[in-house]
């Protein structure tokens, strides 16, 4: 919670206030209202322990808020500007003649809503929203890096496996070639054996017809 | 002014080539373009009527723009008539006729738009009264300054001094806000730099993995080639083995017959 307390006042007359936590902000705020110098428009900040009181005075109307030191100035003063515009838009010229706490019942709810908005909603400040978005982008990119590294590991495994597959297919090709050679040689031997057998049979037949192993009648 | 210069330059160059035929078409096209521009300006002025910017000067400008567009419409209408008369002659290029017809339709469209804008302007001119700035105020200020007294002068100096103090405070405040905003922007800039570094790292990783994928592709291609060759070797081996079976069968048959003959001969 960045903004803890807010009030709207005319001079030192408090018209509306809201406190988000139980602190002594109200007392200190009233002291600050008396201490703010001059009657002209101004923007000032007062430090008190860990909190800072930001005061904005415009056209006789003073808007004050108490914020944590870490909230900086941009968001609290944007809050003050917003509250001032809403207050003037809602009550107009009645601001200059109203009694103390005259608008407190209605406007304290608006103060509460805006305190919550400027304290918690990233959209209240464009720079903070962009910071948040850049953080998201960075997270997504780091996640992407992790995924790509994981993918790299799997690709390495795949490289190893495909290298093994390549080796196996080379071996398969070599063995297939050897097998073909063996089968061819067996075929060759069978052919030669068949030819020899046929020659032997022919010789025996011719020898029988020629009446002798040395073929005397035919030669 | 620059457009008119461009137009005159273009007209001069075109006249050398075409002998003046295309000159009228080009003139009509540029006229329609100028009318379009004028009508846009006129509409923008009409949209300003009824707003705090509505002043007698604006009304005067509106009037001048209306007259200017009227003159442009008159000139372009004459040129369009001249171009259409040229189209009726024999031997005119059909594409020129088509272009002139298109220009005529464009001219009609822009005229309708101008008439609509004129009606809107007339309505708003009667509805609204121009905003006259208060010229009486400066004279009263001037009268006030004439009666300056030393006491008022001293008060004026004191007021100026306070004003300077307030301005200094305002400057300090604005500088603090600007400093804070700059710090936030610096952080955003730093984060963007980090994201840039992450993107570069990612690019390096993706490139390396591209090399790995190329290796995988090479391995798979080699495996496919080797498998194809092995398959062809096996197919040939299968054919040879089939031939072996036939030869073995033939040998057995012949051997059987020989044995049979020998047995018959011995038995006899």
Swiss-Prot record, chain A:
BP term (GO), one: stomatal movement
Residues that span the membrane, as ranges: 190-210
Entry keyword annotation includes ATP-binding: no
Modification sites for N-acetylalanine: 2
One Pfam family, short name: Longin
Tissue and organ distribution: Expressed in flowers, leaves, stems and roots.
One GO cellular component term: plant-type vacuole
Keyword terms, alphabetized: Acetylation, Coiled coil, Membrane, Protein transport, Transmembrane, Transmembrane helix, Transport, Vacuole
Major localisation: membrane
Residue ranges of domain v-SNARE coiled-coil homology in the record: 126-186
Gene3D superfamilies: 1.20.5.110, Longin domain
Origin superkingdom: Eukaryota
Cytoplasmic topological segments: 2-189
InterPro entries documented for this protein: Longin-like_dom_sf, Longin_dom, Synaptobrevin-like, Synaptobrevin-like_transport, V_SNARE_CC
Vesicular side: 211-219
Domain Longin intervals: 7-111
Localization per Swiss-Prot or TrEMBL: Vacuole membrane; Prevacuolar compartment membrane
Domain comment quoted from the record: The longin domain is essential for the vacuolar and subcellular targeting.
Similarity comment text for this entry: Belongs to the synaptobrevin family.
Role this protein plays: Involved in the targeting and/or fusion of transport vesicles to their target membrane.
Name assigned to this protein: Vesicle-associated membrane protein 711
Curated annotation (Swiss-Prot), chain B:
Stretches the record annotates as Disordered: 1-23
GO molecular function term, any single one: SNAP receptor activity
GO annotation, biological process: amyloplast organization; intracellular protein transport; late endosome to vacuole transport; negative gravitropism; stomatal movement
Keyword check for Lipoprotein: no
Keyword terms: Acetylation, Coiled coil, Membrane, Protein transport, Transmembrane, Transmembrane helix, Transport, Vacuole
Effect of gene knockout: The sgr3-1 mutant has a reduced gravitropic response in inflorescence stem but a normal gravitropic response in hypocotyls. Reduced formation of vacuolar membrane 'bulbs'.
Protein name: Syntaxin-22
Naturally occurring in which organism (per UniProt): Arabidopsis thaliana (Mouse-ear cress)
């Amino acid at each position: 919670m960045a903004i803890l307390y807010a009030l709207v006042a005319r001079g030192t007359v408090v018209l509306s206030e809201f406190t988000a936590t139980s602190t002594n902000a109200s007392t200190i705020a009233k002291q600050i209202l008396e201490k703010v110098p001059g009657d002209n428009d101004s923007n000032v900040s007062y430090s008190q322990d860990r909190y800072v009181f930001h005061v904005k005075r415009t056209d006789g109307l003073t808007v004050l808020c108490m914020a944590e030191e870490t909230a900086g100035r941009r968001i609290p003063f944007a809050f003050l500007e917003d509250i001032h515009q809403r207050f003037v838009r809602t009550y107009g010229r009645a601001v200059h003649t109203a009694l103390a706490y005259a608008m407190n019942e209605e406007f304290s709810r608006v103060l509460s809503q805006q305190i919550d908005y400027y304290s918690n909603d990233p959209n209240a400040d464009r720079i903070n929203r962009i910071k948040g978005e850049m953080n998201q982008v960075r997270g997504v990119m780091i996640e992407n890096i992790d995924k790509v590294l994981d993918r790299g590991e799997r690709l390495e495994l795949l490289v190893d496996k495909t290298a093994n597959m390549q080796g196996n297919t080379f071996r398969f090709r070599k063995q297939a070639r050897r097998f073909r050679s063996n089968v061819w040689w067996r075929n060759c031997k069978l052919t030669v054996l068949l030819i020899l057998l046929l020659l032997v049979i022919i010789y025996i037949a011719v020898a029988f017809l020629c009446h002798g192993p040395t073929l005397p009648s035919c030669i | 002014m620059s457009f008119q210069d461009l137009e005159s330059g273009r007209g001069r160059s075109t006249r050398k080539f075409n002998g003046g035929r295309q000159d009228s078409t080009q003139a009509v096209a540029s006229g329609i373009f100028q009318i379009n521009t004028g009508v846009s300006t006129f509409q923008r002025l009409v949209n300003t009527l009824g707003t705090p910017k509505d002043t007698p000067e604006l009304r005067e400008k509106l009037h001048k723009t209306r007259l200017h567009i009227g003159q442009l419409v008159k000139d372009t209408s004459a040129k369009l008539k001249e171009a259409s008369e040229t189209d009726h002659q024999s031997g005119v290029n059909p594409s020129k006729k088509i272009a002139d017809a298109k220009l005529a339709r464009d001219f009609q469209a822009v005229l309708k738009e101008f008439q609509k804008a004129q009606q809107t302007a007339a309505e708003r001119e009667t509805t609204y009264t121009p905003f006259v700035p208060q010229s009486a105020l400066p004279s009263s200020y001037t009268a006030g300054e004439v009666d300056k007294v030393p006491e008022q002068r001293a008060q004026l100096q004191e007021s100026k001094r306070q004003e300077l103090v307030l301005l200094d405070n305002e400057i300090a405040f604005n500088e603090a806000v600007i400093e804070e905003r700059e710090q936030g922007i610096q952080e955003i800039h730093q984060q963007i730099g980090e994201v840039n570094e992450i993107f570069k790292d990612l690019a390096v990783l993706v490139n390396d993995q591209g090399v790995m994928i190329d290796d995988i592709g090479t391995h798979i291609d080699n495996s496919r080639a080797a498998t194809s060759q092995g398959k062809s070797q096996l197919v040939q081996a299968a054919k040879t083995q089939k031939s072996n079976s036939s030869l073995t069968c033939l040998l057995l048959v012949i051997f059987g017959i020989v044995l049979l003959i020998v047995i018959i001969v011995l038995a006899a």
